[in-house]
């Protein structure tokens, strides 16, 4: 029915839910051109970045500049129209939020200031129809769990970070430390065990109930109970916010000389770091943000070849909320905000 409607006209009506002010969504009806690939979202996932907009925790000038805006940059959907010959109607696809406008020989598109990113100054996926270029989509195998596939974007960021780490790190990779017991830390530790099965992965966090879920980790410690003799070769910071200061400080103190520190967490405000020890130990610090198509392809291939990972990732799903109205979307964000652990999945039924 929707395909017939799309093919029968050069324009189509799209219904979007946009955040216009903190904690306030509005419905927007607009016309879009029928071109490239059009996807109907099926499962979306709320990210901490979405919450920072929803809760009004971004700087006031940032909110003024970027709102109104449709949120959400993690999601999967179904192809309903394609005039590029890249997909069949009905194909299940994961959507890539980064949208390059230029190419650079040396800089990855996810770091180019010219790139647009869904849900960050550019409408995200809370619409009944999404128009994308075919290279912003990756087809999913028929047997994939779509609720888990909804946050492939998050997994792809971690894959991207581990790939960049591999290019700069010294060969000594016997002991990894992961700081953070939330979604980011969970997936990072899981993938490190997958990519480096012979290495020891230690997770340091704040919440005992969260750390209990890291059954695949070799060791877990609460932040204030880390033994004095803990030594790691490389550290992954997955904390974010102001708390990342203490996490980075502990990584610097426990890491071996010439180790690498990978920063995943986002802090809205600058934090001090111990440059003296960084210099003394000859450490390398690398920041990670977003991902690109090759990272999505890697994740889809990884999940296809290692279906057991779905069982571990399923533990991350804490809430599943069906979205049929603006109030449903607000309720989902409110539930997600008070959730201590896990991902909130939106079943998009608009």
Say what each PLM segment does:
Residues 30-44, 59-102, 141-143:
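Glycine-rich beta-strand-centered segment in the early N-terminal region that forms part
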Residues 45, 83, 98, 239-243, ...:
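Short glycine-/small-residue-rich Rossmann-like dinucleotide-binding loops
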Residues 74-76, 91-92, 129, 181, ...:
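Residue-level marker of beta-strand positions
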Residues 144-224:
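Mid-domain Rossmann-like dinucleotide-binding core that forms the NAD(H)/NADP(H) cofactor-binding site
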Residues 167-174, 195-196, 211-284:
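Glycine-rich cofactor phosphate-binding loops and adjacent beta1-alpha1 units
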């Amino acid at each position: 029915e929707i395909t017939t409607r799309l093919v029968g006209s050069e324009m189509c009506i799209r219904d979007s839910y946009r955040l216009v002010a903190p904690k306030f969504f509005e419905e927007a009806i607009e016309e879009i051109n029928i071109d490239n690939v059009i996807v109907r979202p099926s499962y979306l996932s709320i990210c901490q970045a979405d919450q920072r907009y929803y809760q009004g925790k971004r700087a006031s000038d940032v909110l003024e500049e970027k709102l109104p805006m449709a949120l959400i940059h993690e999601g999967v959907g179904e192809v309903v129209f394609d005039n590029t010959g890249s997909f069949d109607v009905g194909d299940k696809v994961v959507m890539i939020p980064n949208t390059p406008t230029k190419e650079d020989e040396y800089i990855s598109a996810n770091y180019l200031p010219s790139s647009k990113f869904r849900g960050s100054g550019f409408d995200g996926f809370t619409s009944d129809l999404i128009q994308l270029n075919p290279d912003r989509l990756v087809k999913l195998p028929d047997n994939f769990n779509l609720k888990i596939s909804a946050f492939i974007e998050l997994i792809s960021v971690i894959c991207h970070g581990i790939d960049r780490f591999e290019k700069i790190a010294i060969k000594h990779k016997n002991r990894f430390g992961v700081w953070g017991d939330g979604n980011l830390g969970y997936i990072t530790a899981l993938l490190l065990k997958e990519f480096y099965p012979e290495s020891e992965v230690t997770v340091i966090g704040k919440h005992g109930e969260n750390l209990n879920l890291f059954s695949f980790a070799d060791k877990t410690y609460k932040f204030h109970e880390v033994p004095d003799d803990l030594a790691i070769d490389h550290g992954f910071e997955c904390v974010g916010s102001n708390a990342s200061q203490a996490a980075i400080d502990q990584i610097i103190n426990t890491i071996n000389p010439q180790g690498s520190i990978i920063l995943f967490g986002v802090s809205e405000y600058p934090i001090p770091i111990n440059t003296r020890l960084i210099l003394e130990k000859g450490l390398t610090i690398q920041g990670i943000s977003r991902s690109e198509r090759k990272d999505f392809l890697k994740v889809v291939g990884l999940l296809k070849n290692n279906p057991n990972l779905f069982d571990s990732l399923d533990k991350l799903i804490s809430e599943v909320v069906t979205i049929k109205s603006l109030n449903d979307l607000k309720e989902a964000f409110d539930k997600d905000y008070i959730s201590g652990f896990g991902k909130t999945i939106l079943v998009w039924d608009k």
